[in-house]
Amino acid sequence: MSNLVGKLNEILADEWACVRALRRAESQCDDPGKGEVIKRIRKDCSVNCVSLANVIRALGGRPTDIPSPRFSLKLSDESLTDTLDMFQSTQQHIVDEIAALLDEPDLKSARSPLALVQQLHKENIRWLKSAMT
């Protein structure tokens, strides 16, 4: 079970990194329409953090509140495109990691919240791609 909580905490850290990257993207974006899309997706990621933290607590673990260093790196001359590319890479990583965990027997009661986090990321990937083209 502790291995499962550890894996979920890694996903939560990645989710926090998404929130951080989207905050940077909001400040880099000059287009009000695109800025609203970024803001909405950032709020979804914040909700995902709460959902993941609740799953971790339900499994008897303690949720992390530190963003993943792997996805939190900031380039010195980072453009909006760079930030959003890193964010989308993180989103896809989260989708894949949750997919790998959904069949775990110990996660039976947490499948719905995890599937919802996964689904929100899939929708946000499509939403962001359509808004940025």
What is the predicted function of each stretch?
Residues D65-S72, E97-A115:
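Long amphipathic alpha-helical coiled-coil segments
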Residues L4, K34-V37, L80, D106-A110:
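Residue-level recognition of alpha-helical structural elements
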Residues R24, D31, F71-L75:
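A short small-residue
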Residues V50-D96:
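Carboxylate-rich helix-loop segments that flank metal/cofactor sites and access channels
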Residues P32-P67, W127-T133:
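Conserved alpha-helical segments that form or flank metal/cofactor-binding pockets of metalloenzymes
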Residues G33, V47, H93, S109, ...:
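Short alpha-helical
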